[in-house]
């Protein structure tokens, strides 16, 4: 089906490897064109996250990327606010977009309550539908 075609992979270099292998295996030519780069906001992101949780008391915390989890956790650790972050997240129902994100959270002893079958924002929406989350608040 993709034999002989050229396929653009818009993931970061780290995330592109599995797609490069898969595309090459099917006799297509992969081209890596990373379109998104996550850049840490430093301690600001941790403070904003904690302030939002304190002010809004969200029912759910949704994590859409293992890299974003790592940036948030590493930033919290660097400013000695990791335990505050863990506690704040623990007071919400945690949803991870996929297995890599779930693993990143669980490595830090953050319990993931839900993970969609489809690893995308659509899948997260389906989780909310199943949970009948109408009127609930969420931090993403």
State where each predicted segment sits:
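Conserved beta-alpha
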Residues: 1-140
């Amino acid at each position: 089906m993709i034999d002989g075609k050229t396929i653009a992979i818009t993931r970061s270099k780290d995330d592109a490897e599995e797609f490069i292998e898969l595309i090459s295996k099917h006799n297509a030519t992969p081209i890596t064109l990373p379109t998104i780069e996550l850049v840490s906001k430093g301690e600001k992101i941790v403070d904003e996250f904690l302030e939002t949780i304190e002010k809004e008391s969200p029912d759910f915390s949704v994590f859409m990327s293992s890299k974003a989890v790592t940036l948030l956790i590493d930033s919290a650790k660097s400013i000695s606010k990791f335990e505050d972050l863990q506690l704040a997240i623990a007071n919400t129902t945690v949803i991870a977009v996929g297995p890599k994100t779930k693993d990143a959270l669980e490595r830090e002893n953050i319990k993931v309550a839900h993970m969609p079958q489809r690893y995308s924002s659509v899948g997260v929406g389906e989780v909310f539908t199943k949970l009948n989350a109408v009127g609930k608040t969420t931090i993403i």
